[in-house]
Amino acid sequence: MANTPSAKKRAKQAEKRRSHNASLRSMVRTYIKNVVKAIDAKDAEKAQAAYVLAVPVIDRMADKGIIHKNKAARHKGRLNGHIKALKEAAAA
C-alpha cells in the first residue's frame, strides 16, 4: 500500500487510467467482433461496412498506445483478407 501522498495519488491515477484503457480495449474488441460476425454470416456488404467503421477506431487505439501498432496492423490485414476472400467466393 502507498505510504506517501504522492504515491497514493499515483496509485489513484494508475487505477483510473487502467479502467479507462480497459474500456477502450473493450471497444476495439467490439468493433472487431462486429466485422467477424458479418464475415461468419457470409455477408460481404455488412462486413465491409463494419470494417470501414472499425479501421479508424483500431488506428486511434494504436496511436494512443492502447494496443500495439503491429497488433492493429495484424487485425486490419486479417479482417481485410477475410472480406476479400468472401467477396471472391461470392463472385465465383
Swiss-Prot record:
Binds directly to 16S ribosomal RNA. This is Small ribosomal subunit protein bS20. The keyword Repeat does not apply. Residues 1-23 are annotated as: Disordered. PANTHER family: 30S RIBOSOMAL PROTEIN S20 (PTHR33398), SMALL RIBOSOMAL SUBUNIT PROTEIN BS20C (PTHR33398:SF1). The lineage of its organism: Bacteria, Pseudomonadati, Pseudomonadota, Gammaproteobacteria, Pseudomonadales. One of its GO terms (cellular component) is cytosol. Keywords: Ribonucleoprotein, Ribosomal protein, RNA-binding, rRNA-binding. It comes from Pseudomonas putida (strain ATCC 47054 / DSM 6125 / CFBP 8728 / NCIMB 11950 / KT2440).
